[in-house]
Amino acid sequence: MEITGIICEYNPFHTGHLKQFSMIREKNPDSAIVCLMSGNFVQRGMPAIFDKELRARAAIYCGADLVLELPVTAALSSAEGFAASGVRILGGFCNHLSFGAETPNIDVLLKTADALLSADFNLD
């Protein structure tokens, strides 16, 4: 079974999110869409504009098959912690991850990922 995961907040859900669902369905029509969404608090500890139930219902209504809640400790952490937790959770059962980006240039994204994973950047 194909499963596409999305790490999200939907604060609020908008037409860009709907377009993401449409693009997933277009590229992989048989894939289930699972959203891992922050709860009533979003990144940086801000309260969400709408409660988590309403935001989850909007996602389901617009095409998501399942909405799960990102643990609050992950939602309230740094952007890196938010993303890393989401990838760790969804990576356990999703075949694909879908995300929006400021650039459509995949080469820029891949070079950035390589840099972030390099020994020069990580001092682990």
Give each language-model segment a name.
Residues 1-124:
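Nucleotidyltransferase catalytic core that binds NTPs
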